[in-house]
């Protein structure tokens, strides 16, 4: 096979009259700007007739189950909607063609019309809230959808079979420069004890990649007459839901309860290791996950990176993580072990994917090699060297097809029930 061509994703409308072509499905938020959404829509001229070709980009926050949508009231809020008249091109929508658009139009012909969207950087990243076992309908969370259709005007009601709908993702990657090493300490003075108990904890770094173990260094100086009976370490996910008002949900995603004790007038030091995995948290309804594309698994939601001065209220879901270290201290006295008090510190950290390495535009690959990254575009000088791949994933065993998903849904937790 020689060089791998430019990989382009396509999806056609159920009636086969429109097809949308996009260079990728993940669009990176670089904090100050977001990758533009550029593509083309190919339309059957006999179907188009005297109508116009519209493409819309919608960022929506679904916060309740679809089966509860009644009387025109929906548990969904559109955070951002942009419309482009792709044909005939409106003066305000005309933009210079990108390299990808030029090549697609050259290959597909004169009935391929370009569209480009700019995503504001203060919009949220794609996040899905994990559904419960009995939830039905679309999952709650923030998603982005590109929709193309032919109509006399934007207000015209469009049937699903006459339009193309594609879910894309807005993603962030870990910054190249990590923040300072997380450390925290606290001192607790107890009644009837002359000297205090001191707890100090630290992480080995500030940024962790998904699936990477987290090392927690715990140092206890117990100058009291109390006994530390137990040490509890937990990794917690915090999800700030910013909609009509702001609410915060927290959920432990990794825990260790050690029976390590610290006797009076002694010191203790140990490193604990925890690894937060989605596989260990499948039953937790409402847990924030990275936005999911059909037929692909996902992971715990990545930390949200905010630029300075960002309006937190416009953001749908803000995700952060902390490690909590808690000492369970026996109070002693007449009650003995029946009464205890806690001493705790928290260590915020960042959990994200690393930025993918950019590969050179040309790479010799053997015919038997399967491309690992199907989201990769490789530009070359051969305008005919374009590989089209269906936007919908290959059907996996046991997975429902698009029609089944529309009928049955994948489940959605209601925020009020979290």
Curated annotation (Swiss-Prot):
GO molecular function term, any single one: enzyme binding
Distribution of this protein across tissues and organs: Predominantly localized in neuronal tissues and in the spleen.
Signal peptide location: none
Positions with a binding annotation for 1D-myo-inositol hexakisphosphate: 250, 255, 324, 326
GO biological process, one term: positive regulation of protein phosphorylation
Compositionally biased intervals (Basic and acidic residues): 355-366
Gene Ontology cellular-component annotations: basolateral plasma membrane; chromatin; clathrin-coated pit; cytoplasm; cytoplasmic vesicle; cytosol; dendritic spine; endosome
Impact noted for substituting residue 412 to D: Impairs interaction with SRC; impairs ADRB2-mediated ERK phosphorylation and IGFR1-mediated MAP kinase phosphorylation of GAB1; impairs sequestration of ADRB2 and IGFR1; abolishes interaction with clathrin; no effect on interaction with ADRB2 and IGFR1
Renumbered residue ranges of the record's region Interaction with SRC: 1-163
Residue stretches spanning the membrane: none
Modified residues (Phosphoserine): 412
Annotated spans, Interaction with CHRM2: 45-86
Post-translation changes: Constitutively phosphorylated at Ser-412 in the cytoplasm. At the plasma membrane, is rapidly dephosphorylated, a process that is required for clathrin binding and beta-2 adrenergic receptor/ADRB2 endocytosis but not for ADRB2 binding and desensitization. Once internalized, is rephosphorylated.
Family: Belongs to the arrestin family.
Record note on domains: The [DE]-X(1,2)-F-X-X-[FL]-X-X-X-R motif mediates interaction the AP-2 complex subunit AP2B1. Binding to phosphorylated GPCRs induces a conformationanl change that exposes the motif to the surface. The N-terminus binds InsP6 with low affinity.
Role of this protein: Functions in regulating agonist-mediated G-protein coupled receptor (GPCR) signaling by mediating both receptor desensitization and resensitization processes. During homologous desensitization, beta-arrestins bind to the GPRK-phosphorylated receptor and sterically preclude its coupling to the cognate G-protein; the binding appears to require additional receptor determinants exposed only in the active receptor conformation.
UniProt-recorded name of the protein: Beta-arrestin-1
Organism of origin: Rattus norvegicus (Rat)
Phylogenetic placement of the source organism: Eukaryota, Metazoa, Chordata, Craniata, Vertebrata
